[in-house]
A protein has these predicted regions:
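Catalytic cysteine-centered active-site loop
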Residues: 344-347, 351-352, 385-395
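Bacterial N-terminal signal peptides
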Residues: 1-5
Length: 454
């Protein structure tokens, strides 16, 4: 059996096969080597993940390569390269005593951001790297942070031993790693070797030899589709979801700690989940663009992947909005424009800057949402991203849209459908800028019960 040890300071490359629905879809590599950095003895940790999966009927090829330089158990530099369908994002993070200075190159668009350094946990580039560095988990809980290169944000993780499970006839208590985005289970042998890794989105990793891991993935037909694997089918079945004006659901999942309430979504905690009541927004008078901008200045600012201060974005937003001064009408003009110029393409597996989205005019819901939010802010419309679930055909899929402040309410706008009506089948799980809206929880063991539909 090939295993990966959690013993700190491993100096050899270790390989995993990556599987989705039992089919191998890629491989992962972890290695730690000795090096010299700034004249000091250091450790260089590298992780590489290569994936070939399906997404909404498209084929997605993706590579994530990261490197961390650590001196005396303290990270000094992290580098990430994410590539998919000819697009790349590179992130270099340099650590000081108090902050992280991150430089981002997203498809040629350069930006910088500063992240305060947390005081309650170390920072790693991957949970397996974190456990390698802190192998003594037995009998206690570990807290640490993962640097997410997609959102350029820190994700607080908690690791602890779970209840024992049967693993090929052997009773093993997995190490459970809770991340805001998903839950990972790491199964260890009695010697502390990793024998399997499972995630809440159905992706599994198993140790392989180098030759096995690098062996070409055979084309067996349709690739496993991540959108279908993570889809949630409610009971009873939804009728005519796109014309739904009110929906009351009971949502439960192993890792669902809470959900945001808002002007059109109300949340109540129940014994085994959350009761969610969603009302379709109605056309209401809204305030002027200047009034709304004055009331919500925070949501006018440019942020990661949302370059609303770019002169080209400002000029385009002005052209779309024209002489319109009503916030809701201006937002609908932008939503309609984005829908008219974009073509769905799920083959690009990385988050992209709005400039690149506008240039290529292809993408998935998150690309539509990023471009819509950027143009709204460029037009001085307060806007934030929202993500969660939506049902267009009776099944709930993960989705993204935007919300615009129209004077008294945050009104949702979805640029994917051609029709302007926003159905009550949008279930919001997170909101904000990219770092929070797209760090939502992928639900584990999710169940949705339809309590009422109108």
């Amino acid at each position: 059996m090939v295993t990966l040890s959690l013993a700190a300071g491993m100096l050899e490359a270790q390989y995993f096969g990556v599987y989705l629905q039992g089919q191998r879809v890629g491989y992962a590599l972890y290695e730690t080597t000795r090096t010299v950095f700034a004249g000091k003895s250091a450790e260089r940790s590298r992780s590489l993940t290569v994936l070939k999966i399906g997404l909404i009927g498209s084929e997605v090829d993706m590579k994530i390569d990261s490197e961390t330089i650590t001196v005396a158990n303290r990270p000094l530099r992290m580098r990430f390269l994410t590539s998919s369908a000819g697009r790349t994002q590179t992130v270099e993070a340099r650590f000081s005593e108090t902050s992280i200075e991150a430089s981002i190159n997203n498809g040629g668009t350069l930006s910088n951001t500063t992240i305060p350094l947390p005081k309650d946990g170390r920072i790693y580039d991957d949970p397996i790297t974190a456990l390698q560095a802190q192998p003594g988990i037995a009998g206690k809980e570990l807290n640490f942070y993962i640097f997410d290169p997609s959102s350029v944000a820190l994700m607080k993780n908690r690791a602890f031993f779970g209840e024992k499970e049967d693993m090929d006839g052997v009773s093993i208590a997995p190490v459970i790693v809770e991340d805001p985005r998903l839950t990972t289970k790491i199964y260890l042998s009695g010697k502390g070797d990793i024998v399997k890794v499972g995630t809440s989105i159905g992706v599994e990793m198993k140790p392989l030899s180098k030759a096995q891991a690098l062996e070409e993935i055979k084309n067996t037909g349709t690739r496993p589709d991540l959108a279908e694997v993570t889809a949630i089918r409610p009971t009873p079945t939804l009728n005519n979801p796109q014309t739904t004006k009110f929906l009351k659901l009971k949502v439960s999942a192993e890792n669902l700690r809470g959900m945001p309430s808002g002007d059109f979504q109300k949340i109540e905690k129940s014994d085994s989940g959350w009761t969610v009541s969603i009302t379709q927004p109605r056309a209401e008078p809204s305030k002027s663009i200047s009034e709304c901008a004055k009331a919500q200045p925070t949501w006018l600012k440019a942020s990661h992947l949302i370059p609303s201060d770019n002169p080209k974005m400002v000029a385009l937003a002005k052209k779309i909005v024209g002489s319109t001064t009503d916030t809701a009408k201006a937002a609908e003009k932008i939503r309609t424009h984005v829908n008219s110029i974009m073509t769905p393409d799920a083959g690009i597996g990385i988050l992209r800057d709005a400039n690149e989205v506008l240039k290529t005019r292809v993408g998935v819901c998150r690309d539509y949402a990023i471009l819509t939010a950027t143009l709204c802010r460029a037009a001085k419309l307060p806007a934030k991203l929202a993500s969660g679930l939506v049902s267009f055909d009776g099944t709930f899929y993960y989705h993204a849209w935007v919300e615009v402040f129209t004077g008294s309410k945050w009104v949702p706008y979805d640029s994917i459908p051609s029709a302007p009506e926003f159905s009550a089948t949008h279930v919001k799980l997170s909101e904000g800028n990219v770092d929070t809206a797209f760090a939502f929880t992928v639900l584990s063991g999710a169940k949705i019960e339809v309590l009422e539909q109108k």
